Amino acid sequence: GLYGKRYFTKKVKLIYDDTLSKIKPPFVVVANHCGFVDVGGMVMMLKNNCGSFVISVTQMAQWPGLIKQMGVLAKKQFTVDVNLIKEIKYVLGKGRPVIIYPEAKLSVVGKPNVIKPAVAKLIKLLKVPLVTVRFDGSYLHQPRWSKIKRFCPVNTTVKVAVTEEEIGKISVDEIHRRIVENLTFDDYQYQFDNKISIDIPDLAGGLENILYK
């Protein structure tokens, strides 16, 4: 919407092309997750391919009315959610994409969390193409421990990880390998390689929130 476009103009520089919006649904998107940019950026990139996001029930509790209107799919963490699988199949059957963040939580240090093989099993079960989207720089924009947003470039890499022709032949292990490979990131290395300067008064403000005595 208008707010999203304004945010990605003034708060962060999102670098992307039309690759994702040109892929014909239904398909499943898996992406790394460091913050709001990964969600808002995904909406911007999908354009008219209106997708449904899989989120945890704990997030539903924060803004239940708003989130339900957005058409999200709620997931109970650390369990096999049969109802969720039915809902995902329903959305795909309507010719819409489904977006999953397989790390299940925000990155704490600007590198990936563990991606479990269960997501690869789900992709195999759904029998639709798999698209990976990697965000580089969204952790730098706002680390998990910081309340301050920093203006910086966020680059996106979109890949069709598994095609419609491959999905029936490829193994779960190979699907998992491709997901992990395509979503591997290191935001501080990205900052170093691209000579990104982040100039704010208190660069470490909020870091004490994750320190323990």
Please tell me what each predicted stretch does.
Residues 5-170, 174:
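Soluble catalytic domains of membrane acyltransferases
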Residues 131, 180, 207-210:
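Unusually extended, aromatic-enriched hydrophobic runs near protein termini
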Residues 141-143, 197-200:
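Glycine-rich, charged/polar anion/phosphate-binding loops
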Residues 173-194:
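Short, structured interface segments
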Residues 198-212:
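Short, flexible, mixed-charge glycine/proline-rich loop motifs
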